[in-house]
Amino acid sequence: MTLVGNFSPLVLVGDSDRVEAETVGAYLDGWAGHDKVRLATANAIKAILSGAGRLVGRIARGYLPGDPGKLVGVNSDQDQQKSIDVGSHNLFVELLIAAGVASILSEEADLPVAGKADGLVAVAIDPLDGSGNVGLGAPLGTIFSIFPADVEEPFLQPGNRQIAAGYVSYGNSVDLGFSVGEGVIFATLDPVSGQFHITRRNVKLPERTSDLAFNASVQRHLSAGMQAYVNDAFLGKDGPRGRNFNMRWLGAAVGDMHRIMQRGGLFFYVNDSRPGYEKGRLRLVYEANPIAFLAREAGGKATDGSRPILDIVPQTYHERSALVFGVAEELDILGEYFVK
């Protein structure tokens, strides 16, 4: 008896045998019209989604073809690179160059990769966020920013010059969250058609939250203000906050972003007293910037603890930054602890 064969999806009560929702490609075509920069942006996003579809196919196979977490090198900051890090980098670079972008900045390369000389947009990307989760069944993702390529150093522009930003979350479904400056849109990959179909438009963060996302094991290394905020939250309804809080920490910024965009919350990965963490750990250009862009479009906020992320002018390609993002009200409350 064959235990498994070609899978046909389980059909639930109320399921349709056809997906009628608009595709992301069709949405982008309508948004772009005949505008050259918008067309270039749309083509770049389509290339990323094509890469995401191919990447998730490899993720789903786990260790069957080989070890995706095999160490193969280090990047410019001496972070260990896994086989799947390098493979996903090569995949997205190839597709983005074919899409006609001017240049690509990837976490896995020291310098930007040159693309089309007369390209109109530049793409900053973390090809595989959370690669420490490879092989564990925990969240992984791809996150990107698209900038106009009308300046000499497109990746050293402040985040408020982003044309578009987004992420793909590889979880129990393959979900896209993106914005072209007209609100946040969610879409899900249909493995049957190979297309991302829109599931929600104009996504907004709630006005209040009781969910926090941070690494509690480093609490003792945080600033006095941050420790006071955490302590007050953990006192729950018996403390000064007057309500109970939950904690979530997925170990991948994309995973936490996707959860917060749907359920609300406040994420913080800030600078602390540990060596190498003085300025935070996330990358400003291709992690903090796209998250901040999406948070703003959803009615939330993102700061480095004092400055809006989108106002910061990067000094280097792989500059690190502290990051706090999520529900605006809670971020404002946290800000009060920084000045106490």
UniProtKB/Swiss-Prot annotation:
Task: Name the domain of life this protein comes from.
Answer: Bacteria
From the Swiss-Prot or TrEMBL record, state where the protein is found: Cytoplasm
InterPro entries, per database record: FBPase_C_dom (IPR044015), FBPase_class-1 (IPR000146), FBPase_N (IPR033391), FBPtase (IPR028343), Fructose_bisphosphatase_AS (IPR020548)
Q: Which residues bind Mg(2+) 1?
A: 107, 126, 128
Cofactor (UniProt):
Mg(2+)
Sorted alphabetically, the keyword list is:
Carbohydrate metabolism, Cytoplasm, Hydrolase, Magnesium, Metal-binding
Cofactor binding, note field? Binds 2 magnesium ions per subunit.
Under the heading Gene3D superfamilies, the entry gives: 3.40.190.80, Fructose-1,6-Bisphosphatase, subunit A, domain 1 (3.30.540.10)
Pathway listed for it? Carbohydrate biosynthesis; gluconeogenesis
Q: Where does Mg(2+) 2 bind?
A: 126, 129, 287
List the record's Gene Ontology CC terms alphabetically.
cytosol
Is-annotated flag, keyword Transcription regulation?
Answer: no
Give the residues the record marks as binding substrate.
Answer: 215
Q: Which family does it belong to?
A: Belongs to the FBPase class 1 family.
Which HAMAP family does this one have? FBPase_class1
Name listed for the protein in its UniProt record: Fructose-1,6-bisphosphatase class 1
**Species annotation:** Brucella suis biovar 1 (strain 1330)
Lineage, opening ranks = Bacteria, Pseudomonadati, Pseudomonadota, Alphaproteobacteria, Hyphomicrobiales
